[in-house]
Amino acid sequence: MLALRGRRGKRVRYPADGVAEADEAFVLPRPLRRGVRFLISLGAGRIRFPNHTGTVAAAAFMVATGLYGMSLGGHTQSFAQVSTTAAGFAIEDVRVSGNAQTSEIDILQQLGLDGTTSLVALDIEEARRLIGELPWVETVTVRKVYPGTIEVVLKEREAFGIWQHGSDLSLIERSGSVIAPLRDNKFASLPLFVGRDAETAAAAFYDEFSRWPEFRSRVKAFVRVAGRRWDLRLNNGVVVKLPEKDVARAMSVLAGMQDTHQLLERDIAAVDLRLEDRTTVQLTPEAVKRREVALKAREKMLKAQEKRI
């Protein structure tokens, strides 16, 4: 037999998957080769999937579709809330520190905690914002402690005085900022400032007036007049009218009259110290009547003496 021999030429290589590469006519980039081989094998039936792969894929598709729908409908937070609460992350304890005027109940109500709130789903920044809206809260720190505790650390505002504006009473800071309405006698020992703009000028005047502690203990209220000066309303009803400027001079005059004549213990209604060259003392209506009676009696006595002469 004769052996048939063809002309010797270039060898053609056949890869394992049965696809012959062209004579360097086209070569796939390396990153694409594995994917193409997978698709060819898949089409040729050499790759088989487990029996339940289709069911699992369909279920995964349905779950993904549901999550996408919840996201579009804004229900993601509700779903996370329910699922994580059921998993044992419900908020069961709220630890509050640094609070003197803010109660734990105030914080629970502000956060809307009802026993089913999830710690995982709780928005810390939103919790800080909500607690910060409480009247006494200056700063707040909120921290999650898993599995079911919130730690709240407060720094509260400090009440400096009471401000009366019209018929309303409010607690104020040194800056004059209103903290909250006055609702009980807990702060009765704080100084009372009355009038428009009194809250913003209160701290500076009160600090200056601390130079005369013997008078400060007598003051029932510091009354702001026309946004320029102060009147002192004393515990016994006497009103001391201070000048707009040079309060120290006026208080020095008042101190001298008190030491010499015990002026503030007398039956007077007001002491006017607004003018530098004079001090005016206003009597009470009862004192005025007594003075009129005394003057009339004195006139009668003088007339009687003249007749005798």
UniProtKB/Swiss-Prot annotation:
UniProt entry keywords in alphabetical sequence: Cell cycle, Cell division, Cell inner membrane, Cell membrane, Membrane, Transmembrane, Transmembrane helix
UniProt superkingdom: Bacteria
Stretches of the chain found on the membrane's Cytoplasmic side: 1-52
Localisation: Cell inner membrane
Gene Ontology cellular-component terms listed: cell division site; plasma membrane
POTRA domain location: 89-157
The UniProt record lists the keyword Transmembrane: yes
Membrane topology: Single-pass type II membrane protein
InterPro entries from the UniProt entry: Cell_div_FtsQ/DivIB_C, FtsQ, FtsQ_C_sf, POTRA, POTRA_FtsQ_type
Periplasmic topological domain: 75-309
GO BP term, pick one: cell septum assembly
TM region(s), chain numbering: 53-74
Principal place of residence: membrane
Function according to Swiss-Prot or TrEMBL: Essential cell division protein.
Membership in a protein family: Belongs to the FtsQ/DivIB family. FtsQ subfamily.
Stated name of the protein: Cell division protein FtsQ
Classification lineage: Bacteria, Pseudomonadati, Pseudomonadota, Alphaproteobacteria, Hyphomicrobiales
